[in-house]
Swiss-Prot record:
Coiled-coil region(s): 326-418, 444-472, 509-602, 835-923, 977-1116, 1209-1265
InterPro entries the record matches: MukB (IPR012090), MukB/SMC (IPR050308), MukB_hinge (IPR032520), MukB_hinge_sf (IPR042501), MukB_N_dom (IPR007406), P-loop_NTPase (IPR027417)
Species annotation: Salmonella arizonae (strain ATCC BAA-731 / CDC346-86 / RSK2980)
Name of the protein this chain belongs to: Chromosome partition protein MukB
Stretches the record annotates as Disordered: 1049-1074
Amino acid sequence: MIERGKFRSLTLINWNGFFARTFDLDELVTTLSGGNGAGKSTTMAAFVTALIPDLTLLHFRNTTEAGATSGSRDKGLHGKLKAGVCYSMLDTINSRHQRVVVGVRLQQVAGRDRKVDIKPFAIQGLPMSVQPTQLVTETLNERQARVLSLAELKDKLDEMEGVQFKQFNSITDYHSLMFDLGIIARRLRSASDRSKFYRLIEASLYGGISSAITRSLRDYLLPENSGVRKAFQDMEAALRENRLTLEAIRVTQSDRDLFKHLISEATDYVAADYMRHANERRVHLDQALAFRRELYTSRKQLAAEQYKHVDMARELGEHNGAEGSLEADYQAASDHLNLVQTALRQQEKIERYEADLEELQIRLEEQNEVVAEAAEMQEENEARAEAAELEVDELKSQLADYQQALDVQQTRAIQYNQAISALARARELCHLPDLTPESAAEWLDTFQAKEQEATEKLLSLEQKMSVAQTAHSQFEQAYQLVAAINGPLARGEAWDVARELLRDGVNQRHLAEQVQPLRMRLSELEQRLREQQEAERLLAEFCKRQGKNFDIDELEALHQELEARIAALSDSVANASEQRLALRQEQEQLQSRIQHLMQRAPVWLAAQNSLNQLSEQCGEAFSSSQEVTEYLQQLLEREREAIVERDEVGARKNAVDEEIERLSQPGGAEDQRLNTLAERFGGVLLSEIYDDVSLEDAPYFSALYGPSRHAIVVPDLSQIAEQLEGLTDCPEDLYLIEGDPQSFDDSVFSVDELEKAVVVKIADRQWRYSRFPSLPIFGRAARENRIESLHAEREVLSERFATLSFDVQKTQRLHQAFSRFIGSHLSVAFEDDPEAEIRRLNGRRVELERALATHENDNQQQRLQFEQAKEGVSALNRLLPRLNLLADETLADRVDEIQERLDEAQEAARFVQQYGNQLAKLEPVVSVLQSDPEQFEQLKEDYAWSQQMQRDARQQAFALAEVVERRAHFSYSDSAEMLSGNSDLNEKLRQRLEQAEAERTRAREALRSHASQLSQYSQVLASLKSSYDTKKELLNDLQRELQDIGVRADSGAEERARQRRDELHAQLSNNRSRRNQLEKALTFCEAEMDNLTRKLRKLERDYHEMREQVVTAKAGWCAVMRMVKDNGVERRLHRRELAYLSADELRSMSDKALGALRLAVADNEHLRDVLRLSEDPKRPERKIQFFVAVYQHLRERIRQDIIRTDDPVEAIEQMEIELSRLTEELTSREQKLAISSRSVANIIRKTIQREQNRIRMLNQGLQSVSFGQVNSVRLNVNVRETHATLLDVLSEQQEQHQDLFNSNRLTFSEALAKLYQRLNPQIDMGQRTPQTIGEELLDYRNYLEMEVEVNRGSDGWLRAESGALSTGEAIGTGMSILVMVVQSWEDEARRLRGKDISPCRLLFLDEAARLDARSIATLFELCERLQMQLIIAAPENISPEKGTTYKLVRKVFQNTEHVHVVGLRGFAPQLPETLPGTQTEDTPSEAS
């Protein structure tokens, strides 16, 4: 039998009055005896402190403070300690004979709060010879010792071999160790458990009936049916988990779509961007290479353009220089043409003026003759008029004389006046102031003679004038001609000069005749010279373009060579066109083929992805469509086999579930009907009675009872006989055994035990041999063991079933995948790799592009050579006909020579043209120049003077004649009028006068008209002379201007000048055109160079930027690739089919996915933030982080109890497989897990019955307990009425409330709480939740009401209350209750602690003086019967007869307070020896 653990001793170190005191504890009762203040309570306080070191619970008060809530501030502990380190230690021996020392180190904490610091510790493996005081003290001398600190204690124990020291930071750990080693009876897991234990100790210490315990006896006495509760909790948890799993499945079904949506959209979003970046990286690399190629090409082009620019600039400079000279030549030619035209116009004017002058000269000569004739006629008219005037005057005078004669006085007076007038006129005219009428006659003769002489002289001079005038006009004309030709000269030199001019004129005329031939010759030579110069220019240009100087003799050979080269290049160009066409056709075919392959590549890649997925899923590699179809047939066969095996495993699992369900019935009833029959018969199942049988005894009892192990034990068989009639709802064999269920044993059979078998003698003639079953199920332990093994088997079967179901689903899905693959991709999956073909074709395309580029360069060079050759041939075609000109080196000299001769001839022609008419006129009259009639003017003057003298003499003679004629009239001064002697004469005179006057009038009119005509003729002559002079001056001016022009104006001069100007204009135009072309070309070249420079800068910038971008992108791409590879998502993101989409398509795909993702992650803050961060186009790695975050988020949302993978994509596939199977399995599991309300009621009832039976057995132990008038103590256990109603409803009327228990929204606990509220609406549930209430209703303790009853005197059984009992009776009754509690705790803890440990039992009783001797004897008897230790504190007048007694006396010695302790054994004869602690009776322990 297992020995119970005991407390050996209590050690106090440095307590108030106890420096180092060890109290050896008795195995039953230890009594502390002493007066007030002796230290009894301090000793028990030290014990309690070591047992429960919880400052929140410890409160040591005396009886006067009982019930007080505010005692001393230190709660009684601080004042019981001395300053410094204090210890309280318990030395124990457990059932395993292990010595364990547990205790606490206490130390006062300085301050107003009077706190105490407590450190629990434990010592194991301490030898029996070592006393606790030796451990914690160090002897300094004979009378002094020092208390060790906890660290020093630890170091001291570490030096001892085999001793273990443990210090605890948690009271729970301290109590856990004490429970495991059997020091305390209950595992104190929480502060609530410690509080219960402390309340029990406190109730024991202060005695009496503790209201704190009696109010909660259920918590102290009734064990927490943790198994049932755990079963309920597990069932509910399983149901909850099942429902949560079902809900999770439903959520997962939606999550599946979310998974698909998230994965699809996230993959599209990230993969599109990933592939776009991959494509862009490739494109950027290609662009960088293209930029570099273009950069090199542009540099070459720029260099070529620079060379071309230099050549064109040089040529442009040459043309600019040539243009200046050509412009000067052209301007000179234009000016020369203008001069020639001006000279021609001048020449025309000169000729016109000369013709006009000749005409004017002729008209002038004619007019001179007309004027001369008119002058002569005027003179005649004047003479005639004078004669008529004279005749009229004479007639008038005659008529006057006649009338005077008739009238002497009048007439003579008139005559006299007239005579006087005539005399005065004669004096004036004749310049004779002394002239008198008498001398008039003489002077008349003189003057008449003078007149005659003047007339003769005038006639002579007139004759001379006529001859001189003819000679003078010829000489003057000839002289003027000579002066006009030669210029001013002396008149004497005119003859010689005229002859020289006539000779020179002949020569000049001969030279002038040679102008036209010379001009034609010069024009021809100049044309040849220009052609020679053009040929030289062409040759120089040809040599310049050819880059080599050629001799004239080499040109024909070069022409033939170029002709041959042109023919060869023409063939080459023609062949090049065909070759280029062939290359381009091949390139187009390649491009078309590549486009076709690029269109087919995504389909092929999709087929390959599907094929790879199939290969990964099935672990096979397929190389042909036939292998795929063959494997599909194998899949079908495998699916059939897996279905068969799954069905077999499912059947076995169902059988195991049924067996587990059968074995899980309450009370071990495999048939539910047995519980009903047991309740009906008022019996107990035999299996329930033996429910606590150990696993070792289970085979024996199973064989012992055999088929009757499911019997019902009834108190009286005779009472149920009638109930058996008509019983149908029962098993086929129903065994009934008569017996007391409370004290049933196996004595009903006669049994012989054999080896692993029994022989049961049922009757004299009937034996039964039963072997021990290999798997016994009799008793709870055996059933639990069997259920455990069945659960293990079920787990294996479930796992196998799940595996097989998964395999079947997987196989079916694989079959579907193969079917889809065959339907969609089989036709293209095993074709050649289009990407490999694309790579090969791209390589070939690159080769073709390179060949085309090379061909284009060669063709360009050939075309350039061809064009150069054609230009060379064209230039040579222009040059070859002019080779003779190029070879003619004297052409320029001949041109100069002819030019000189032409200049002379043109000079002669100009001389002839200018002076030819004068020379022609000079030639017939040149002879007149031999003598110069220079007296002509003098003669002309003499003639005029003679003519005037003759006129004056005539007038003088006439005036003198008139005076002479009127000489007689001078004498009539005194006379009268003379009368006429004949009237007829007067008449005749009058007639003649009228005729004379008429004649005079006519003469006057004729004179007047002739004078006007003469005046007109003179005016015409004057105008002609003026016109002649003017035109002569103009002619001279024109001739001078012509001479000033200095240009020979012949008939061909203008044509030659115009031809020269046009040639120069053509050359200038060509030069300008070429210059403009060069300028344009140069401008274009400069623009091209600028463009190339800008392009080059841009290319360099773009190349460097692209290179930097490529390098940066490479770093970013490396980071992206590293992140992709580290997270294992490359296979998800590198979707090769996306490589064939454009960047816009990929961006559109990514943007669409982004929009969908924004909606999908709108409720997820983390993914929303990561998604927002991933939208940065400059940080592509953030999209990978988002993808990883999505995968991580989906991994976290994957229920590992449903899906066995971390990959969300595989999770989707497994979801499809698992969801339907799990739904079915969990639905059936829920049906199996769901416990019926009847079963719950039965379980609670059975538990209540069992605990009632246990309480009755505890009551049997208290029946003999008596204290004073109390004869017996018992516990009364009743079921509450409201809860009994609940059990009845659960058992009999559960169908009425299935709306609660069949609801998937309510757990069983919540449904139970709802039912309780429905049945008891009057009860206020407060703020508690239905789940809390339901859990309380699942605890059977809440169904029971417990109260303590005592049998006291004549009152009989009544409720134990302090007011109804004496103090001693209350203490005894309370102690009895505490003993029941401790025993109940041990029974409850037996399942938790090892089977080989029986815990220590110890209670306290302070102030035991209230008990009488009989009551104390009862306590001693109770302790002995229950193997319990008891510490009693009693006054000095209490001396128990048994146990150990310590006498405590507090003394003061030398100002030092200490407690004197004397220990004695009990007075009973069986314990005569004195305890070791009593030997120091006279030697007090003193504190140093």
